[in-house]
Regions:
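Extended alpha-helical interface modules used as scaffolds for assembling large macromolecular complexes
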Residues: 1-203, 209-213, 254
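Nucleic-acid nuclease catalytic cores
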Residues: 205-251
Length: 254
């Protein structure tokens, strides 16, 4: 919650709303901010703190980003990611009205099917964005925003991992049932594929999941199951083409 208040520093740093939006685009769409090593090493200067080129280092000083390597900064954890995503939604006037989401999640408690939750996200969350936004967003935005919506309603049932490192690669999203709940040992792996509007017709025409995508998520599920044999694994591939097409396949023969 302390970070929630500190996020208002973005407004102070960027001075105008458009600059704040650009900063958040970099954080929640690209997932990283380029920074200058000399700026990071330089002596603290209050005047420079509000300079446009110094924004990434200013956020680092405020504890709102962390260093990924010698060139870029990233958000420090999933809690920060969720908070920034909430702030992004506020700035872009994206509603989080529970009445649009709760019915789908109540049904999930009965049938445990993930596909309706993806469809709910596509309609009620992505459906609020203007068409031009879909040329800018990417798979990183899709996985992070879907996680943020899921975490509002399923955080008592699952823990979440975004871009989980596995021997076969990085899984976009992993849901793991919490011990002591009815979801214990229920593990879901979700792989997202995002397409621009020009590819919507191609995605719409797909009758089955592409074999290479199914194989990818199978490998991720196998990696997890080798480490945790008691898990009941389920795996999914989600195709989203701008705001036009959404298709979800559950991959079998894990």
């Amino acid at each position: 919650e302390n970070l929630r208040t500190d996020v208002n520093w973005i407004r102070r740093l960027t001075i105008i709303l458009e600059n704040a939006k650009e900063m958040l685009d970099a954080l929640v769409i690209d997932g990283e901010l380029i920074y200058s090593q000399p700026d990071l090493r330089s002596k603290f200067n209050k005047q420079k703190f509000f300079d446009l080129d110094f924004y990434p280092v200013s956020l680092y000083y405020l504890g709102m980003t962390t260093l990924k390597d010698n060139y870029v900064m990233v958000l420090p954890n999933l809690t920060a990611q969720s908070i920034y995503m909430n702030y992004y939604n506020e700035l872009n006037q994206i509603s989080d009205d529970a009445r649009c989401f709760v019915p789908a999640y109540r049904l999930f408690m009965d049938h445990r099917k993930l596909k309706p939750l993806v469809e709910n996200y596509f309609k009620e969350y992505l459906g609020q964005f203007p068409a031009q936004v879909f040329d800018k967003i990417n798979e990183n935005f899709i996985r992070c925003s879907f996680y943020e919506v899921l975490s509002r309603y399923l955080s008592n049932c699952y823990t979440f991992a975004v871009e989980q490192n596995l021997p076969s690669g990085r899984a976009d999203l992993v849901l793991t049932g919490i011990s002591g709940t009815a979801f214990h040992n229920d593990c879901r792996v979700v792989e997202f594929k995002y397409f621009k509007a020009k590819d919507a017709t191609m995605v719409e025409a797909l009758k089955v999941v592409r074999p290479e995508d199914a194989d990818q998520v199978r490998r991720y599920a196998a990696d997890i199951n080798r480490q945790f044999p008691a898990y009941r694994m389920r795996a999914y591939v989600v195709y989203i083409a701008a705001g036009k097409v959404c298709k979800t396949w559950e991959v079998i023969n894990l």
